[in-house]
């Protein structure tokens, strides 16, 4: 009887000790809003901070490499910030507050951008009936060149896209994607790529001009895929 009691006591001590020394874990899931473009190689770096100090780094070109799912084990209580750059080189972050020893899960979207504050200034968003917004695109690289255009117009409550002389109406998802592209052009930061994408957006007497040298965003080609339009090469 004494032996059984002692054994149960020993098991209880071990259990309490293990529970006391256990730590939390965070699983970072990398996802994409655009299911047509899920290239992990376009995410160059992820940094994890605890209470303001960096504790882990992941990269596209050096170990430990960025993977679709990243698990951080043996984490003590505290505030953890997951910092990364999206496809237009905006620095974004997610915060996980660890207060107990359990499994935490957080998703980061590599192609998410904080563009919604710019929607009110969008030419397409403010398009009036029987007017048009013109998009001109030119891409030049070491081994390619391309020159294309889209015209967005409005008749009644319907929006239309014209490409290569053909026109059709746009659904809500397609219209939102065009507005998103226009807004994200305003957010694109530094580049450094040998490929330069030049955008001009015109509405009446107003015109906006942008250059994308990120080699990550690929906004024009992604939009053409969504609209089911073919690329033109020159």
Predicted regions and their residues:
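Short, surface-exposed beta-strand/beta-hairpin micro-motifs centered on an aromatic residue
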Residues: 63-74
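A short, solvent-exposed beta-strand micro-motif common in secreted/extracellular proteins
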Residues: 76-88
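Short, well-ordered, aromatic-rich surface patches in folded extracellular/luminal domains
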Residues: 94-134, 173, 186-188, 195-234
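Short, solvent-exposed coil/turn segments at beta-strand boundaries
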Residues: 49-53, 76, 99-103, 153-157, ...
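N-terminal domain-start interaction segment
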Residues: 32-44, 114-166, 191-206, 234
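Short amphipathic beta-strand segments in non-cytosolic proteins
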Residues: 45-62
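Bacterial Sec-dependent N-terminal signal peptides
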Residues: 1-31
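Mature extracytoplasmic domains of secretory-pathway proteins
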Residues: 158-190
């Amino acid at each position: 009887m004494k032996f059984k009691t002692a054994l149960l006591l020993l098991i209880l001590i071990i259990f309490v000790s293990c529970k006391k020394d256990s730590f939390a874990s965070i699983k970072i899931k990398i996802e994409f809003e655009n299911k047509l473009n899920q290239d992990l190689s376009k995410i160059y770096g992820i940094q994890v901070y605890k209470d303001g100090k960096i504790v882990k780094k992941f990269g596209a070109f050096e170990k430990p490499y960025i993977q679709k799912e990243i698990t951080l084990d043996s984490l003590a209580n505290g505030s953890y910030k997951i910092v990364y750059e999206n496809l237009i080189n905006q620095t974004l972050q997610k915060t996980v507050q660890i207060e107990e020893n359990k499994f935490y899960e957080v998703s980061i979207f590599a192609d998410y951008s904080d563009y919604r504050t710019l929607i009110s200034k969008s030419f397409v968003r403010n398009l009036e009936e029987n007017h048009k917004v013109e998009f001109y695109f030119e891409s030049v690289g070491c081994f390619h060149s391309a020159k294309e255009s889209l015209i967005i117009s409005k008749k009644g409550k319907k929006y239309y896209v014209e490409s290569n002389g053909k026109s059709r109406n746009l659904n809500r998802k397609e219209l939102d994607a065009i507005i998103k592209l226009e807004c994200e052009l305003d957010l694109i930061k530094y580049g450094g790529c040998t490929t330069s994408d030049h955008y001009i957006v015109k509405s009446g007497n107003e015109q906006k001009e942008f250059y994308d040298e990120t080699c990550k965003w690929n906004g024009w080609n992604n939009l053409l895929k969504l609209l089911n339009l073919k690329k033109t090469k020159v």
